[in-house]
Swiss-Prot record:
Belongs to the arginase family. Agmatinase subfamily. The gene is speB. Pathway: Amine and polyamine biosynthesis; putrescine biosynthesis via agmatine pathway; putrescine from agmatine: step 1/1. The keyword ATP-binding does not apply. Mn(2+) binds at residues 128, 151, 153, 155, 232, 234. It catalyses: agmatine + H2O = urea + putrescine. GO terms for biological process: putrescine biosynthetic process from arginine, via agmatine; spermidine biosynthetic process. Keywords: Hydrolase, Manganese, Metal-binding, Polyamine biosynthesis, Putrescine biosynthesis, Spermidine biosynthesis. Its EC number is 3.5.3.11. This is Agmatinase. Its cofactor is Mn(2+). Pfam families: Arginase. Signal peptide: none annotated.
Length: 307
């Protein structure tokens, strides 16, 4: 049996590194590969404030992606993304479970090394805190970023905790990783501070506006900056994604979210993640399927640039 040794440790997990996204064979040598995009599972959920279990998200998303692998041309796209992009799955990040500091160091180092070798990162969480070390790695490589953030929560809360999945986008502007005035948060429907100049597109507004209007606002906000795209699955209404740690009623439908994503093809998206899938609360794997579909849609955004 082959084991992942990402970050120099041997992975003996029973729930990770079994098979790849879209049935891709696992590639445990991602840095030396010829990949355009590298998928990494991030089984971390020690920063949650509600229900835990997102550490099982990568495995659930990969398992659900089997249902998507058969379709050569993902509807409504007109090409097979696997023919346009060299995509590999390098398995799950290996870190000392229970040690958040070690996780942050390993996550940032792994993403930074991939970028230095000319790869791009699609990360499967895991709770939303994983985005902070990913932003650090990407900002070091690309400079200050614009953020496109799908979520029910702004995650701009200042509670003094170093490791919390609700504080990343308070910390990231302070560290100079993102420009909040060029960043947009979509699907928000919880109380939040207005001290930071994020463009907030609330769930009621997004559901009321046309998809074209929402896409226009996103593009107008981020402009031509390098973009990091993060999708918290609780952006979707719980009827479409019950399997998550902090579900909030009144969210987006999966159809609307996918249509918005498809409108972002001409943006300079340099890194992406899908987070907060917690399969123990799921029903019939619909949340995992939503996460897998969104991840695949993100890859199609990149493939569309090859036109």
């Amino acid at each position: 049996m082959q084991y992942s040794t990402l970050a120099g440790q041997t992975d003996n997990s029973l729930v990770s590194n079994n098979f790849g996204f879209l049935r891709l064979p696992l590639n445990f040598m991602p840095y030396e590969s010829h990949a355009d995009w590298v998928i990494t599972g991030v089984p971390y959920d020690m920063a949650v404030s509600g229900r835990s279990g997102a550490r099982f998200g990568p495995e659930a998303i990969r398992r659900a992606s089997v249902n998507l692998a058969w379709e050569h041309r993902r509807f409504p796209w007109t090409f097979d993304v696997r023919e346009r992009l060299n995509i590999i799955d390098c398995g799950d990040l290996v870190f000392s479970f229970g040690d958040s500091r070690d996780f942050v160091e390993k996550m940032e180092a792994h993403a930074g090394k991939l970028l230095s070798f000319g790869k791009r990162c699609l990360s499967l969480g895991g709770d939303h805190f994983i985005t902070l070390p990913l932003l650090r790695a990407h900002a070091r490589y690309f400079g200050k970023l614009a953020l496109i953030h799908f979520d029910a929560h702004t995650d701009t809360y200042d509670n003094g905790s170093e490791y919390d999945h609700g504080t990343m986008f308070y910390t990231a502007p302070k560290e100079g990783l993102i420009d909040p005035s060029r960043s947009v948060q979509i699907g928000i429907r919880t109380e939040h501070s207005k001290k930071l100049p994020f463009t907030v597109l609330s769930a009621p507004k997004v559901n009321e506006d046309s998809v074209e209007e929402t896409v226009r606002k996103i593009k107008e906000t981020v402009g031509n900056m390098p973009v990091y795209l993060t999708f918290d699955i609780d952006c979707l209404d719980p009827s479409f994604a019950p399997g998550t740690g902090t579900p909030v009623c009144g969210g987006l439908s999966s159809d609307r979210a996918l249509k918005i994503l498809r409108g972002l093809t001409d943006l300079d998206i340099v890194g992406m993640d899908v987070v907060e899938v917690a399969p123990s609360y799921d029903q019939s794997d619909i949340t995992a399927l939503a996460g897998a579909t969104i991840a695949l849609e993100m890859l199609y955004l990149q493939g569309a640039k090859k036109d």
